A protein has these predicted regions:
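Macromolecular interaction modules
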Residues: 1-241
Length: 241
């Protein structure tokens, strides 16, 4: 499966409630209908931000983004052909007037599940996106991340067993602004991933432990820049198909 992922920050002149209402009540149903009738879109997923106010976690997960939008396809060819249909579509499909173009970004990649959540246990998901470490080419970084890093992670049950979901998205630089300007600006982030856990406390515990810092974190730093990532935390996912 392939996925267009869009980290969306709203236009500052629009309230979060108004932005999410337009996104969920108007845009997402229209986009799902159009993408399936005119293209090969499988589904639209809108993830809503978890309210972390009063939890002490806002400093860890600052509310930079207001929503995460996912457009799912069977192949890169399906994605490219369908996105071209959106680019020439009607005004109701446009979201660019409602977002902050200086912050919002999207990218396209192949989804590679490493620990699927078949039982739907992920009450909370964290989606991240980042860049490869200097000195690595993207293909080699993708290969190491896919083949070696999950093996390393499984050596740390304090992290691996707490996660109900871990999937990688290997993004490819095969689209540009001309295909996604109706949604938000395109910016290439080679690597993105979804991690899930039943609760935010369990998700934090998966990464806030000595074994993660001693074993997994150094491996992440070999091929990527985990200190410089986009992050979005959600406890509500809405699917439109």
């Amino acid at each position: 499966m392939w996925r267009l992922s869009a980290f969306l920050a709203r236009n500052p002149d629009i309230s979060r409630d108004a932005f999410l209402s337009r996104l969920v009540d108007q845009w997402a149903p229209s986009a799902a209908s159009f993408g399936q009738q005119r293209g090969a879109l499988k589904q639209v997923v809108v993830s809503l931000p978890q309210d972390l106010s009063g939890t002490g976690l806002e400093s860890l997960f600052p509310p930079v983004f207001d929503a995460l939008v996912e457009l799912w396809f069977d192949s890169s060819e399906d994605a490219l052909s369908t996105l071209s249909q959106f680019a020439g579509g009607e005004d109701a499909l446009r979201l660019d007037d409602a977002i902050d173009p200086s912050t919002s970004v999207c990218f396209l990649g192949e989804v590679k599940p490493k620990k699927p959540d078949h039982d739907g246990k992920s009450g909370v998901r964290m989606t991240v996106a980042g860049h490869v470490r200097e000195g690595w080419n993207i293909d080699d970084a993708h290969r190491y991340w896919s083949e070696v890093h999950p093996v390393v992670a499984q050596k740390v049950p304090e992290t691996w067993e707490r996660l109900s979901l871990y999937q990688q998205i290997h993004n490819k630089n095969i689209i540009g602004d001309e295909l996604v300007s109706w949604l938000c600006p395109y910016q290439y982030y080679p690597m993105s991933a979804d991690m899930g856990a039943p609760t935010i406390q369990q998700l934090l515990a998966a990464y806030d432990n000595e074994q993660y810092m001693a074993i997994i974190r150094p491996d992440e730093q070999k091929f990527s820049r985990p200190e410089d990532m986009l992050t979005f935390v959600s406890d509500r996912r809405l699917t439109f198909n």
